[in-house]
Amino acid sequence: MKATDFSKVAEVYDNNSFRFDELAFDIHLEGYIHGQPQQHYNVMDLACGTGIYLDHQMGHFDAHSIEWHGVDASEAMLGKAREKLKRGNLVQGLAEDLPYVSNSFDFIINNYAFHHFTRKSQVLDEVYRVLKDGGIFKTHNINVHDMENWWIYQYFPSAYTEDLERFWQKQRIFRELEDRGFKVRLETNYQMEKLKVTDYLQLAENRDISVLTIISDDDYYAGLSKMKNDLEHNPAKTMMNDFSELVCIAEK
């Protein structure tokens, strides 16, 4: 599978407002804290990127003693995270070779990033290793197998082919976690709605969405040109859009 070069998107990554809208208060972390009362918690954002999740959650959980950790392979993305965050431990490292001793973390979150890992099975082995007994691994991602008519795929068809290679199906995610000894609960949601094409042109032009960085330039500019041509002929053009998300909670 192809990999995104995040050094090329770090500068524009946070221009996508949807990244901020989608990361609300983490009810699963709250549930873990309430269900496992203790004096101190270690929480890791695995593939933390520019620190959006950590920045959102730190304020919500000020009443608790939490040591926040962020790990990412991209120094460019971590540089943006350091600009946001006044505290927390940010480390450059690989998810398949985490720089932590075993049984270190109470809660590990992986937001919109599992598809980037080229050695996913090894990543899950590492997550299991560094997670404490009774700890939680949460992964939250789009569910591409149930959203064939996502606006991205309508204008950039080769992106769908790439994503089918990058994303595990939900059944495999469940099985891989369960085979390692996790107790797994997986939920998906789905929505179909009509979107205005004009509302998504800027997102396409920003080219921060990872799959748009790995398709060929020819495919990318062909899709962008089609969006612009459609809007030139009909500024009010709409399209039906599929969207689905997956949340998986795995308890060690």
Predicted regions and their residues:
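A conserved beta-strand element that flanks and buttresses the S-adenosyl-L-methionine
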Residues: 109
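A short glycine-rich, Lys/Arg-flanked "PGG" loop and its adjoining helix->strand segment in the class I
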Residues: 121-136
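Conserved Class I S-adenosyl-L-methionine
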Residues: 21, 50, 183-252
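Short catalytic micro-motifs in class I SAM-dependent methyltransferases
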Residues: 112-116
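Short alpha-helix
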Residues: 165-180
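Conserved class I S-adenosyl-L-methionine
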Residues: 1-41, 52-56, 60, 77-80, 136-165
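Class I SAM-dependent methyltransferase SAM/SAH-binding core
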Residues: 44-97
